[in-house]
């Protein structure tokens, strides 16, 4: 009973971070098992390991994508490593809203439970991890599995938003006097930028999937062409979240690598200020390139030229980061010890 209360009711940032890491790693193993079934099915001609059940193959693809994105990668970085290390690196005793931190973890658990419920309900949700209409519309998937999936996305998104608000409150409200923003490690900067990305993009995704629920259950026609809706509206809303999601995943890793370089090399990364500005620039440009995921839908030439050009621009701040890391590696004596 003591251990159950310690885990379930704990408000310690370290305990919550470890719970996030443990659950997310288990979810990662589950997603990996799904990917093995997908590869086995593709490697066999004719009826494979799924015995010709094409719907269940689509369910596996959907669950694998959603689990890996929402239940593995994001919780490992923002829920696990950020929760555990940001207060330690900042000199704070804990996060500014400890109970909100605990609430975000249990909302994450509830979202994962809703996702598993969608997997096990009737024939499952064979809609793809992007959840495009018309596959998710009631005419093609009338079961409650799709509703469970949308509800899971809502819960997982709210969990990430609460976690991000907690992080922003911790960094800005608990900042010590005379402690400059430039004194933050690059991992803290990466976590801050990622939290802002989550707060901006997740409500857009939530709005898009809420309209899906309305189409399925309340006879609206936001994505029904016959009723005056637009199928591409959901794609724009989804990829406005989906492309910054790439940077939500990678920017904390940028900061983590920079911090590892500093620790192993016993010196600051070359041009830390440029590293901060490059992460900020990557995040800003990431909001203006979402439609390069939609080139096949028939956009005009000017639109494709714009999104393609801005996509190329993201390579510039990325090159700055790679140059600074390379320079730090070349002119630093790293100490890496391997124990027998």
From Swiss-Prot:
The keyword Chaperone does not apply. Binds 2 heme A groups non-covalently per subunit. Binds a copper B center. Its cofactor is heme; Cu cation. It is a multi-pass membrane protein. Ca(2+) binds at residues 41, 46. Keywords: Calcium, Copper, Electron transport, Heme, Iron, Membrane, Metal-binding, Mitochondrion, Mitochondrion inner membrane, Respiratory chain, Translocase, Transmembrane, Transmembrane helix, Transport. GO terms for molecular function: cytochrome-c oxidase activity; heme binding; metal ion binding. O2 binds at residue 247. Cu cation binds at residues 243, 292-293. It is found in: Mitochondrion inner membrane. Pathway: Energy metabolism; oxidative phosphorylation. GO terms for cellular component: mitochondrial inner membrane. Its EC number is 7.1.1.9. The chain crosses the membrane at residues 18-38, 42-62, 66-86, 100-120, 148-168, 186-206, 237-257, 279-299, 305-325. It catalyses: 4 Fe(II)-[cytochrome c] + O2 + 8 H(+)(in) = 4 Fe(III)-[cytochrome c] + 2 H2O + 4 H(+)(out). Fe(II)-heme a binds at residue 64. One of its GO terms (biological process) is electron transport coupled proton transport. It holds the Pfam family COX1. Belongs to the heme-copper respiratory oxidase family. Component of the cytochrome c oxidase (complex IV, CIV), a multisubunit enzyme composed of a catalytic core of 3 subunits and several supernumerary subunits. The complex exists as a monomer or a dimer and forms supercomplexes (SCs) in the inner mitochondrial membrane with ubiquinol-cytochrome c oxidoreductase (cytochrome b-c1 complex, complex III, CIII). This is Cytochrome c oxidase subunit 1. It comes from Strigomonas oncopelti. The gene is COI.
């Amino acid at each position: 009973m003591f251990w159950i209360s310690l885990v379930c009711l704990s408000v310690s940032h370290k305990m919550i971070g470890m719970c996030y890491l443990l659950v997310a790693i288990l979810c990662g193993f589950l997603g990996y098992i799904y990917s093995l079934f997908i590869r086995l099915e593709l490697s066999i001609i004719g009826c494979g390991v799924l015995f010709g059940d094409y719907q269940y193959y689509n369910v596996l693809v959907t669950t694998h994508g959603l689990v890996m994105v929402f239940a593995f990668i994001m919780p490992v970085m923002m829920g696990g490593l950020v929760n555990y290390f940001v207060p330690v690196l900042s000199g704070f005793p804990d996060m500014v809203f400890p109970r909100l931190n605990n609430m975000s973890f249990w909302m994450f658990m509830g979202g994962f439970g809703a996702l598993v419920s969608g997997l096990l309900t009737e024939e499952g949700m064979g809609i793809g991890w992007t959840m495009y209409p018309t596959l998710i519309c009631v005419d093609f998937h009338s079961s409650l599995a799709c509703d469970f999936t949308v509800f899971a996305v809502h819960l997982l998104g709210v969990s990430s938003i609460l976690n991000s608000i907690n992080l922003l409150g911790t960094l800005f409200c608990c900042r010590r006097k005379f402690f400059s923003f430039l004194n933050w490690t690059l991992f803290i900067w990466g976590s801050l930028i990622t939290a802002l990305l989550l707060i901006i993009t997740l409500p857009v995704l939530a709005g898009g999937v809420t309209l899906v629920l309305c189409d399925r259950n309340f006879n609206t026609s936001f994505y029904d062409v016959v009723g005056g809706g637009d199928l591409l509206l959901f794609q724009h809303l989804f990829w406005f979240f989906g492309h910054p999601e790439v940077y939500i995943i990678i920017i904390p890793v940028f900061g983590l690598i920079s911090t590892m370089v500093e620790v192993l090399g016993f010196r600051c990364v070359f041009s830390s200020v440029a590293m901060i500005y490059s992460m900020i620039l990557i995040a800003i440009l990431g909001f203006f390139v979402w439609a390069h995921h939609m080139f096949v839908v028939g956009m005009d030439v000017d639109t494709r030229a714009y999104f393609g050009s801005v996509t190329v621009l993201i390579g510039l701040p990325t090159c700055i980061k790679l140059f600074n890391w390379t320079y730090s590696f070349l002119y630093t004596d790293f100490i890496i010890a391997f124990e027998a």
